[in-house]
Regions:
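Phosphate/dinucleotide-binding and metal-coordinating scaffold of catalytic cores
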Residues: 1-268
Length: 268
């Protein structure tokens, strides 16, 4: 049988090859931080949102068997002395306007608790007026895509708007991530000591987006990236406490006295 040799493919003349300009490959540490700045234009945060919070005592199993007076009495340091977790109560969060809850908003037309409530903050927890963390239960919806609603009173700041103003300014700064904020007029109805109570005006709060894995993803960042809550603002090295998890002497409790791990545990 005859064998026919394959014809060689025609070569491309050098003059027909185009050279394109490519961006140089960047080292990972040289890539600028970018967040989704469009996120800040989804909702109008220039006004004031009205929230109605009905608090009631729950049960021991969920740790909500407390009164509203207890929630507002103890500071973080009191809980540390007692060696217990922060007290919580049941909460029914409803969002609306100055007339009441509004159709389409979280909690509308609901009568059973959809959240838990506890104080938030560290030194601010010693103030007479507390900051609150409202955690919407799973399956009970979200508010602006958030299940955790952090309300800050800013008692130490006479004007009460500097915190929000700072976050608003951060929105326009490249390579700096911010958090969504909203002024909130809060009304609270306390049913922990009986029924029939009316809503009490708690005044103006600043709602600040909870920085967690959900927020990282929402802002276009790595959901599994490094994220820490700073518990000590002295910013010393603390070699004896701040160690890698691979270090035989690593102690999570000592590490989190300074930095509480909220994301990846890879501390490199």
């Amino acid at each position: 049988a005859e064998h026919t040799a394959a014809e060689p493919e025609p070569s491309t003349p050098e003059s027909a090859v185009q050279t394109v300009e490519k961006e140089p490959v960047q080292e990972i540490n040289g890539i600028p931080l970018r967040e989704n700045k469009d996120l800040y234009s989804v909702y109008d945060d220039s006004g004031i949102v009205t929230m109605y919070l009905t608090v009631s005592s729950g049960n021991e199993a969920e740790g909500t068997n407390h009164t509203w007076a207890e929630i507002n009495h103890y500071s973080v340091y009191d809980y540390e002395k007692m060696g217990v977790e922060r007290y919580q109560v049941n909460g029914l969060l409803q969002v609306g306007d100055e007339n009441g809850p509004v159709v389409g908003e979280v909690g509308y037309n609901e009568i059973v608790p959809n959240a838990t409530v506890q104080i938030r903050g560290q030194t601010s927890s010693t103030n007479d007026q507390k900051n609150y963390k409202i955690e919407l239960k799973k399956g009970k919806g979200t508010w602006r895509g958030q299940r955790t609603i952090a309300l800050n009173k800013h008692m130490g700041e006479g004007l009460r708007f500097r915190n929000k103003m700072a976050y608003d300014l951060i929105e326009g700064i490249p390579q700096m991530t911010g958090l969504r904020t909203q002024f909130v007029h809060l009304y609270v109805r306390d049913l922990t000591t009986g029924s029939g109570a009316a809503f009490e005006d708690y005044g103006l709060y600043t709602q600040v987006e909870q920085l967690n894995k959900t927020a990282l993803k929402t802002h276009g960042l790595d959901r599994n990236g490094q994220l820490y809550k700073v518990n000590s603002f002295e910013f010393q090295r603390y070699e004896d406490d701040l160690k890698l998890t691979t270090d035989p002497d690593y102690d999570e409790k000592k590490f989190e006295q300074h930095l509480e791990t909220k994301g990846s545990s890879d501390h490199t």
